Regions:
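Histidine-centered catalytic micro-motifs
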Residues: 118-125, 155-163
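Active-site glycine-centered loops adjacent to acidic/histidine catalytic or metal-binding residues
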Residues: 5-6, 46-47, 121, 158-159
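Extended active-site neighborhood of metal-dependent phosphoesterases/phosphodiesterases
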Residues: 15-112, 116, 134-137, 142, ...
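Extracellular low-complexity, Gly/Ser/Thr-rich intrinsically disordered linkers
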Residues: 84-85, 120-124, 268-308
Length: 319
């Protein structure tokens, strides 16, 4: 089982003076299902895990590094599963140079792995309420060049509690400067951000695309810039890509049902599919020497929420 972070909810901000005690109770709840006693679990540090050391008391991480540590919980780590190298990044430390160094070390130690997968918490190519935040897109533009330079195949993320899958992407880069304060003020106007009502899955857009207000114009220009239209790689044939140069980014929905966020009203160009119906989901990954396949299901009826998606590499057949 791979988790992209936020095994718990409580933080110092939400529970001043009580976060350590309350988060410990939440970790106990997370680990309580009997099935977890017989399954290996690989977790990633999320922002809710990162402000006290309780996370480190529950998860033994192999091949741990001091690189990527935020000084409270541990740094990056890696493991191999079959022919796949999983590199788990603690991006609560935003020092991209450390994550780059860690990935280079992990790859050098495992040169024969066919597939390279990165897991981190923030949805750097997601499609719900956090995905357009400058804090998130800035992290995108610092990390992605290192992912591409190290031939990463797939990046798994969380944070936004809504499912999304991108096109294959390569070469996205920052073109507009925009601050978190500017963004937050406009987001409050635009989509009533926050945990969504059970009856609403996509937030309505309150700011008109033809607004002439300077703040609105700057906001819409920023949103257009982070669509990364030019990064979309034209290698897709149906729900299969063959020998791509770029990377697939997938953001997980909530698997527990404890919290959901709305999809943003203006779906980003880089998104191939997205889904939010306030139902927990889980994804199953199947890997062979030549294929990497993802299926994602609802927990209430085990129906798929997206088509089967497969990456093929090292093959020449015409599909």
């Amino acid at each position: 089982v791979v988790s992209a972070g936020d095994q718990i909810q409580t933080t110092k901000k939400k529970s001043p003076g009580k976060s350590e005690m309350t988060s410990e109770i939440e970790y106990t709840g997370y680990l309580s299902p009997d099935v977890l006693k017989s399954l290996p679990v690989a977790t990633t540090v999320g922002n809710h895990d990162a402000d006290n050391a309780n996370y480190t008391y529950h998860f033994n991480t192999p091949n741990s590094s001091d690189l990527g540590s935020n000084g409270v919980v541990g740094g990056d780590y890696y493991f191999t599963y079959g022919n796949t190298l999983f590199m788990m990044l603690n991006t609560q430390d935003t020092n991209a140079a450390e994550h780059k160094q860690f990935m280079e070390q992990a790859i050098a130690a495992n040169p024969n792995c066919t597939w390279r997968v990165v897991t981190l918490h923030q949805d750097i190519y997601g499609s719900a309420e956090h995905s357009n935040e400058p804090e998130i897109t800035n992290l995108r533009y610092t990390l992605v060049p290192y992912f591409e330079a190290n031939d990463v195949d797939v990046v798994l993320t969380g944070h936004d509690h809504a499912y999304s899958r991108t096109h294959i992407l390569e070469g996205g880069h920052k073109t507009v400067e925009y601050t978190d304060d500017e963004f937050d003020a406009e987001l409050d106007k635009d989509m009533d951000a926050g945990e969504n009502p059970a009856t609403r899955y996509e937030a309505p857009a309150n700011i008109s695309t033809d607004s002439k207000e300077p703040a609105d114009v700057a906001y819409l220009n920023y949103l257009n810039a982070v669509m990364d239209k030019d990064a979309i790689e034209d290698t897709e044939k149906g729900e299969t890509v063959v020998n791509p140069d770029g990377i697939l980014y997938m953001t997980a929905n909530s698997s527990s049902g404890s919290k959901y966020y709305d999809l943003v009203p203006r779906m980003q160009s880089y998104i191939a599919n997205r889904w939010q119906e306030d139902v927990p989901t889980y994804s199953v990954i199947d890997v062979t020497d030549n294929t990497f396949t993802i299926n994602t299901y609802r927990t209430d009826n085990d129906q798929k929420i997206d088509e089967t998606f497969t990456i093929k590499k090292g093959v020449t057949e015409d599909i």
